[in-house]
């Protein structure tokens, strides 16, 4: 699903950190196949796309600042950091050729 969300033909403007943020908030594993998610997961995904894009426009786009505290953004850049929600270790790995940060305890 991560590769689909990064495809600019379908989701223009969605960058790597934004896709990680969306999937984390939607509680979806970035390795899931895009055709294999339920309608409930799909609805949650689209809701989080809107939330993250709007939040990024308000915080990052306006002044070039960082997203709000509590976002995955702040914990995704280095190995060994903890999930802001669960305080469990985050995984950083390559998915679809991109560095991906996700929390296996909540992203199924």
Task: Locate the predicted segments by residue.
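Basic, nucleic-acid-binding surfaces and adjacent catalytic neighborhoods in DNA/RNA-processing proteins
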Residues: 1-108
């Amino acid at each position: 699903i991560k590769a689909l969300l990064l495809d600019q033909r379908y989701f223009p403007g969605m960058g790597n950190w934004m896709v990680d943020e969306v999937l984390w908030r939607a509680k979806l594993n970035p390795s899931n196949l895009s055709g294999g998610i339920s309608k409930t997961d799909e609805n949650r995904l689209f809701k989080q796309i809107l939330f993250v894009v709007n939040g990024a426009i308000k915080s990052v786009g306006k002044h070039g600042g960082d997203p709000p505290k509590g976002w995955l953004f702040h914990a995704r850049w280095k190995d060994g950091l903890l999930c802001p929600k669960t305080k469990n270790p985050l995984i950083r790995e390559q998915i679809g050729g991109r560095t991906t940060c996700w929390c296996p305890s909540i992203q199924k």
